[in-house]
Amino acid sequence: DVKEKYMGPLIKTQMTRCIHCTRCVRFATEVAGVPEIGAIGRGENMQITTYLEKSMESELSANVIDLCPVGALTSKPYAFEARPWELKKTESVDVMDAVGSNIRVDTYNWEVKRILPRLNNDINEEWISDKTRYSCDGLLKQRLDVPYIKKENKLQKSNWDEALDLLIKKIKEVQPNEIAGHIGDMINMENALGFKKLFNLIKSNNLEFREKKFYINSSEKINYIFNSSINGIEQSDLILLIGTNPRHEASMLNARIRKAFVQNKVPIFSIGDPGDLTYDYKIISDKTDEIKKIVNNESELSNKILSAKNPIIIIGESVLELESGKYIFLIELFKKAPPPIDITELYLFNSAKVISFSIFLK
Protein backbone atom coordinates (compact mmCIF):
# COMPACT_ATOMS: atom_id res chain seq x y z
CA ASP A 1 0.00 0.00 0.00
CA VAL A 2 1.61 3.26 -1.22
CA LYS A 3 0.37 6.36 0.58
CA GLU A 4 0.55 9.90 -0.78
CA LYS A 5 2.97 12.21 1.00
CA TYR A 6 2.29 15.77 2.12
CA MET A 7 4.91 18.20 0.77
CA GLY A 8 3.11 21.49 1.27
CA PRO A 9 0.66 23.62 -0.72
CA LEU A 10 2.77 23.72 -3.89
CA ILE A 11 3.71 20.08 -4.53
CA LYS A 12 1.11 17.38 -5.25
CA THR A 13 2.29 13.79 -4.82
CA GLN A 14 1.26 10.59 -6.55
CA MET A 15 3.74 8.13 -5.10
CA THR A 16 2.49 5.09 -7.05
CA ARG A 17 4.40 6.62 -9.98
CA CYS A 18 7.67 7.08 -8.08
CA ILE A 19 10.63 5.08 -9.46
CA HIS A 20 13.04 6.06 -6.66
CA CYS A 21 15.41 7.92 -8.97
CA THR A 22 16.18 10.33 -6.07
CA ARG A 23 16.43 13.38 -8.33
CA CYS A 24 14.27 15.36 -5.89
CA VAL A 25 16.46 14.23 -2.98
CA ARG A 26 19.65 15.36 -4.71
CA PHE A 27 18.14 18.70 -5.72
CA ALA A 28 16.95 19.48 -2.19
CA THR A 29 20.31 18.53 -0.70
CA GLU A 30 22.80 19.78 -3.29
CA VAL A 31 21.14 22.74 -5.04
CA ALA A 32 18.55 24.11 -2.60
CA GLY A 33 20.67 23.32 0.45
CA VAL A 34 17.61 22.26 2.43
CA PRO A 35 17.85 18.46 2.88
CA GLU A 36 14.20 17.91 3.74
CA ILE A 37 13.45 15.22 1.16
CA GLY A 38 15.00 11.80 1.60
CA ALA A 39 14.49 8.06 1.34
CA ILE A 40 13.43 5.82 4.20
CA GLY A 41 13.18 2.04 4.21
CA ARG A 42 15.16 -0.46 2.14
CA GLY A 43 14.50 -2.50 -0.97
CA GLU A 44 10.85 -2.75 -1.92
CA ASN A 45 9.92 -0.79 1.23
CA MET A 46 11.86 2.31 0.18
CA GLN A 47 9.82 5.55 0.21
CA ILE A 48 10.57 9.14 -0.78
CA THR A 49 9.29 11.48 1.91
CA THR A 50 9.87 14.73 3.77
CA TYR A 51 10.40 12.63 6.92
CA LEU A 52 7.92 14.58 9.09
CA GLU A 53 5.58 15.14 6.12
CA LYS A 54 5.65 18.90 6.46
CA SER A 55 5.94 21.66 3.88
CA MET A 56 9.41 22.12 2.38
CA GLU A 57 11.09 25.20 3.82
CA SER A 58 12.87 26.13 0.63
CA GLU A 59 12.29 29.04 -1.72
CA LEU A 60 13.25 26.71 -4.61
CA SER A 61 11.11 23.73 -3.60
CA ALA A 62 8.81 23.60 -6.65
CA ASN A 63 11.74 22.90 -8.99
CA VAL A 64 11.38 19.23 -8.03
CA ILE A 65 8.19 19.27 -10.13
CA ASP A 66 10.23 19.91 -13.27
CA LEU A 67 12.86 17.36 -12.22
CA CYS A 68 10.51 14.44 -11.60
CA PRO A 69 10.61 12.22 -14.73
CA VAL A 70 7.39 10.29 -14.05
CA GLY A 71 4.91 12.79 -12.60
CA ALA A 72 5.09 11.58 -9.02
CA LEU A 73 5.59 15.22 -8.01
CA THR A 74 3.35 17.72 -9.79
CA SER A 75 2.17 21.29 -9.29
CA LYS A 76 -0.75 21.38 -6.85
CA PRO A 77 -2.17 24.80 -7.93
CA TYR A 78 -1.94 23.80 -11.62
CA ALA A 79 -3.59 20.37 -11.18
CA PHE A 80 -6.47 19.81 -13.67
CA GLU A 81 -6.25 23.42 -14.92
CA ALA A 82 -5.33 22.69 -18.56
CA ARG A 83 -3.64 20.30 -20.98
CA PRO A 84 -0.14 21.29 -22.16
CA TRP A 85 -1.15 21.27 -25.85
CA GLU A 86 -3.99 23.73 -25.12
CA LEU A 87 -1.63 26.39 -23.80
CA LYS A 88 0.03 29.24 -25.64
CA LYS A 89 3.69 29.38 -24.67
CA THR A 90 5.41 32.78 -24.46
CA GLU A 91 9.06 33.32 -23.55
CA SER A 92 9.56 36.11 -21.03
CA VAL A 93 11.66 37.44 -18.14
CA ASP A 94 10.72 37.35 -14.46
CA VAL A 95 9.96 40.68 -12.76
CA MET A 96 9.50 39.42 -9.19
CA ASP A 97 13.09 40.42 -8.41
CA ALA A 98 15.98 42.12 -10.18
CA VAL A 99 17.79 38.94 -11.26
CA GLY A 100 15.87 38.63 -14.52
CA SER A 101 15.33 34.87 -14.53
CA ASN A 102 14.33 33.49 -17.93
CA ILE A 103 10.82 32.05 -17.87
CA ARG A 104 8.09 30.65 -20.08
CA VAL A 105 4.54 31.84 -19.50
CA ASP A 106 1.78 29.36 -20.44
CA THR A 107 -1.62 30.95 -21.07
CA TYR A 108 -5.10 29.65 -21.85
CA ASN A 109 -7.09 32.37 -23.60
CA TRP A 110 -6.34 35.40 -21.40
CA GLU A 111 -5.47 33.49 -18.19
CA VAL A 112 -1.92 32.74 -17.09
CA LYS A 113 -2.02 29.08 -16.06
CA ARG A 114 1.58 28.43 -15.12
CA ILE A 115 5.14 29.77 -15.26
CA LEU A 116 8.08 27.49 -16.04
CA PRO A 117 11.85 28.11 -16.13
CA ARG A 118 13.84 28.53 -19.34
CA LEU A 119 17.44 27.39 -19.52
CA ASN A 120 19.93 30.25 -19.23
CA ASN A 121 23.29 29.27 -17.79
CA ASP A 122 24.31 32.92 -17.41
CA ILE A 123 21.46 33.78 -15.04
CA ASN A 124 19.11 31.20 -13.51
CA GLU A 125 20.40 27.97 -15.11
CA GLU A 126 17.27 25.77 -15.21
CA TRP A 127 15.71 26.85 -11.90
CA ILE A 128 13.29 29.54 -10.75
CA SER A 129 12.10 30.56 -7.30
CA ASP A 130 8.68 29.63 -5.94
CA LYS A 131 7.80 33.34 -5.89
CA THR A 132 8.45 33.51 -9.63
CA ARG A 133 6.59 30.28 -10.38
CA TYR A 134 3.41 31.08 -8.46
CA SER A 135 3.23 34.87 -8.73
CA CYS A 136 0.61 34.38 -11.46
CA ASP A 137 -1.93 33.11 -8.90
CA GLY A 138 -2.90 36.67 -7.95
CA LEU A 139 -3.07 38.20 -11.41
CA LEU A 140 -6.86 37.98 -11.66
CA LYS A 141 -7.64 39.00 -8.07
CA GLN A 142 -8.81 42.60 -7.53
CA ARG A 143 -7.22 43.62 -10.81
CA LEU A 144 -7.49 47.28 -11.79
CA ASP A 145 -8.41 47.09 -15.46
CA VAL A 146 -10.48 50.29 -15.73
CA PRO A 147 -9.78 53.80 -14.41
CA TYR A 148 -11.57 55.08 -11.30
CA ILE A 149 -12.51 58.71 -10.61
CA LYS A 150 -13.29 60.09 -7.16
CA LYS A 151 -16.76 61.61 -7.13
CA GLU A 152 -18.38 62.84 -3.91
CA ASN A 153 -15.53 61.30 -1.91
CA LYS A 154 -16.06 57.85 -3.47
CA LEU A 155 -14.13 56.06 -6.20
CA GLN A 156 -16.40 55.25 -9.11
CA LYS A 157 -15.74 53.25 -12.27
CA SER A 158 -15.08 55.31 -15.35
CA ASN A 159 -13.71 54.87 -18.88
CA TRP A 160 -10.45 55.94 -20.48
CA ASP A 161 -11.93 58.80 -22.52
CA GLU A 162 -13.47 60.43 -19.45
CA ALA A 163 -10.37 59.81 -17.32
CA LEU A 164 -7.95 61.28 -19.89
CA ASP A 165 -10.15 64.32 -20.51
CA LEU A 166 -10.30 64.98 -16.77
CA LEU A 167 -6.51 64.52 -16.45
CA ILE A 168 -5.80 67.01 -19.25
CA LYS A 169 -8.22 69.50 -17.69
CA LYS A 170 -6.55 69.20 -14.25
CA ILE A 171 -3.05 69.61 -15.74
CA LYS A 172 -4.10 72.84 -17.46
CA GLU A 173 -5.55 74.24 -14.23
CA VAL A 174 -2.28 74.11 -12.23
CA GLN A 175 1.29 75.32 -12.57
CA PRO A 176 3.94 72.82 -13.82
CA ASN A 177 5.77 72.87 -10.47
CA GLU A 178 2.53 71.75 -8.77
CA ILE A 179 2.42 68.52 -10.77
CA ALA A 180 4.22 65.44 -9.44
CA GLY A 181 4.56 61.93 -10.80
CA HIS A 182 5.56 58.58 -9.32
CA ILE A 183 6.53 55.48 -11.26
CA GLY A 184 6.14 51.90 -9.99
CA ASP A 185 8.65 49.14 -9.35
CA MET A 186 7.56 46.91 -12.23
CA ILE A 187 7.41 49.37 -15.09
CA ASN A 188 9.36 48.62 -18.26
CA MET A 189 11.91 50.93 -19.89
CA GLU A 190 9.65 52.03 -22.76
CA ASN A 191 6.89 53.23 -20.43
CA ALA A 192 9.37 54.79 -17.99
CA LEU A 193 10.94 56.81 -20.80
CA GLY A 194 7.50 57.81 -22.10
CA PHE A 195 6.53 58.99 -18.61
CA LYS A 196 9.65 61.15 -18.40
CA LYS A 197 8.96 62.64 -21.85
CA LEU A 198 5.43 63.52 -20.71
CA PHE A 199 6.83 65.45 -17.73
CA ASN A 200 9.38 67.15 -19.97
CA LEU A 201 6.46 68.23 -22.16
CA ILE A 202 4.56 69.78 -19.25
CA LYS A 203 7.85 71.23 -17.91
CA SER A 204 7.77 69.57 -14.50
CA ASN A 205 10.78 68.04 -12.76
CA ASN A 206 8.78 66.53 -9.89
CA LEU A 207 9.27 62.94 -10.96
CA GLU A 208 10.16 60.18 -8.51
CA PHE A 209 10.46 56.40 -8.39
CA ARG A 210 11.84 55.81 -4.88
CA GLU A 211 9.56 55.01 -1.94
CA LYS A 212 12.45 55.57 0.48
CA LYS A 213 15.38 57.94 0.57
CA PHE A 214 18.50 56.38 -0.94
CA TYR A 215 21.98 57.63 -0.16
CA ILE A 216 23.63 56.75 -3.45
CA ASN A 217 25.90 58.40 -5.98
CA SER A 218 24.01 57.81 -9.22
CA SER A 219 26.37 59.85 -11.40
CA GLU A 220 28.19 56.66 -12.42
CA LYS A 221 26.34 53.60 -13.67
CA ILE A 222 28.70 51.21 -11.89
CA ASN A 223 27.30 52.47 -8.58
CA TYR A 224 23.79 51.07 -9.11
CA ILE A 225 24.18 47.92 -11.20
CA PHE A 226 25.35 44.38 -10.57
CA ASN A 227 28.68 44.83 -12.35
CA SER A 228 29.81 41.24 -12.73
CA SER A 229 27.53 38.66 -14.32
CA ILE A 230 25.50 36.26 -12.19
CA ASN A 231 27.56 33.30 -13.37
CA GLY A 232 30.70 35.32 -12.55
CA ILE A 233 30.04 34.47 -8.91
CA GLU A 234 31.32 30.97 -9.62
CA GLN A 235 34.75 32.40 -10.53
CA SER A 236 35.04 34.43 -7.33
CA ASP A 237 37.46 33.47 -4.56
CA LEU A 238 35.98 35.69 -1.82
CA ILE A 239 32.44 36.98 -1.29
CA LEU A 240 31.44 39.78 1.08
CA LEU A 241 27.75 40.47 1.75
CA ILE A 242 26.85 43.92 3.07
CA GLY A 243 23.34 44.37 4.45
CA THR A 244 21.67 41.78 2.27
CA ASN A 245 19.82 38.49 2.57
CA PRO A 246 20.18 37.01 -0.93
CA ARG A 247 18.14 33.94 -0.03
CA HIS A 248 14.93 35.97 0.21
CA GLU A 249 15.84 39.04 -1.85
CA ALA A 250 17.24 37.12 -4.83
CA SER A 251 16.82 33.36 -4.53
CA MET A 252 18.63 32.55 -7.79
CA LEU A 253 21.57 34.74 -6.79
CA ASN A 254 21.74 32.86 -3.50
CA ALA A 255 21.75 29.54 -5.38
CA ARG A 256 24.82 30.72 -7.33
CA ILE A 257 26.60 31.75 -4.13
CA ARG A 258 25.83 28.34 -2.63
CA LYS A 259 27.17 26.66 -5.78
CA ALA A 260 30.44 28.60 -5.46
CA PHE A 261 30.64 27.68 -1.77
CA VAL A 262 29.95 23.96 -2.30
CA GLN A 263 32.06 23.40 -5.42
CA ASN A 264 34.93 25.86 -4.88
CA LYS A 265 34.93 26.29 -1.08
CA VAL A 266 34.71 30.07 -1.51
CA PRO A 267 34.95 31.90 1.85
CA ILE A 268 31.90 34.08 2.51
CA PHE A 269 31.76 37.02 4.93
CA SER A 270 28.90 39.28 5.96
CA ILE A 271 28.41 42.67 7.54
CA GLY A 272 25.06 42.20 9.26
CA ASP A 273 23.31 38.93 10.11
CA PRO A 274 21.27 37.69 7.13
CA GLY A 275 20.09 34.49 8.87
CA ASP A 276 20.10 31.03 7.30
CA LEU A 277 21.50 31.29 3.76
CA THR A 278 21.94 27.51 3.15
CA TYR A 279 25.74 27.85 3.35
CA ASP A 280 28.32 28.79 5.96
CA TYR A 281 29.49 32.37 6.32
CA LYS A 282 31.30 34.47 8.90
CA ILE A 283 29.73 37.62 10.35
CA ILE A 284 32.44 40.29 10.55
CA SER A 285 30.24 42.87 12.26
CA ASP A 286 26.65 44.03 12.50
CA LYS A 287 27.55 47.73 12.18
CA THR A 288 28.35 49.78 9.09
CA ASP A 289 31.37 51.21 10.94
CA GLU A 290 33.14 48.05 9.85
CA ILE A 291 33.24 49.44 6.29
CA LYS A 292 35.39 52.34 7.52
CA LYS A 293 37.74 49.87 9.20
CA ILE A 294 38.05 47.90 5.97
CA VAL A 295 38.90 51.11 4.09
CA ASN A 296 41.53 52.11 6.65
CA ASN A 297 43.06 48.63 6.61
CA GLU A 298 42.06 48.10 10.24
CA SER A 299 39.89 45.04 9.60
CA GLU A 300 40.92 41.41 9.26
CA LEU A 301 39.10 41.44 5.94
CA SER A 302 41.16 44.22 4.31
CA ASN A 303 44.15 42.10 3.36
CA LYS A 304 41.94 39.19 2.33
CA ILE A 305 40.12 41.40 -0.19
CA LEU A 306 43.35 42.84 -1.56
CA SER A 307 45.02 39.44 -1.87
CA ALA A 308 42.01 37.78 -3.51
CA LYS A 309 42.12 37.44 -7.31
CA ASN A 310 38.37 37.70 -7.92
CA PRO A 311 36.64 39.15 -4.83
CA ILE A 312 32.98 40.09 -5.06
CA ILE A 313 31.23 42.51 -2.71
CA ILE A 314 27.43 42.30 -2.85
CA ILE A 315 25.65 45.33 -1.40
CA GLY A 316 21.99 45.13 -0.40
CA GLU A 317 19.47 47.87 -1.10
CA SER A 318 18.75 48.28 2.63
CA VAL A 319 22.27 49.69 3.15
CA LEU A 320 21.43 52.64 0.91
CA GLU A 321 18.68 53.69 3.32
CA LEU A 322 21.34 54.45 5.95
CA GLU A 323 23.10 57.80 5.81
CA SER A 324 26.42 55.97 6.04
CA GLY A 325 25.50 54.04 2.89
CA LYS A 326 26.86 56.76 0.60
CA TYR A 327 30.41 56.07 1.80
CA ILE A 328 30.33 52.56 0.38
CA PHE A 329 30.92 53.93 -3.11
CA LEU A 330 33.94 55.96 -2.03
CA ILE A 331 35.96 52.99 -0.86
CA GLU A 332 39.38 53.54 -2.41
CA LEU A 333 40.59 50.21 -1.05
CA PHE A 334 38.26 48.32 -3.38
CA LYS A 335 39.36 50.43 -6.35
CA LYS A 336 42.93 49.22 -5.86
CA ALA A 337 41.87 45.58 -5.82
CA PRO A 338 41.92 43.66 -9.12
CA PRO A 339 39.77 44.01 -11.14
CA PRO A 340 39.32 47.73 -10.33
CA ILE A 341 36.02 48.99 -8.87
CA ASP A 342 33.68 46.51 -10.57
CA ILE A 343 34.07 44.06 -7.70
CA THR A 344 31.27 45.99 -5.98
CA GLU A 345 27.84 44.66 -6.94
CA LEU A 346 24.68 46.49 -5.93
CA TYR A 347 21.61 44.28 -5.76
CA LEU A 348 18.32 46.22 -5.97
CA PHE A 349 15.06 44.55 -4.91
CA ASN A 350 12.96 45.45 -7.93
CA SER A 351 13.39 44.91 -11.63
CA ALA A 352 12.65 48.52 -12.61
CA LYS A 353 14.99 50.25 -10.15
CA VAL A 354 18.06 50.13 -12.43
CA ILE A 355 15.98 51.43 -15.35
CA SER A 356 14.64 54.25 -13.18
CA PHE A 357 18.11 55.23 -11.95
CA SER A 358 19.33 55.39 -15.57
CA ILE A 359 16.39 57.42 -16.89
CA PHE A 360 15.28 59.73 -14.07
CA LEU A 361 18.58 60.67 -12.45
CA LYS A 362 20.33 61.75 -15.64
For each feature predicted by the language model, list its residue ranges.
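Membrane-interfacial loop-to-helix junctions in multi-pass inner-membrane proteins
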Residues: 2-3, 8-13, 84-86
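Residues forming anionic-ligand binding surfaces in small-molecule and nucleic-acid pockets
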Residues: 1-7, 42, 139-149
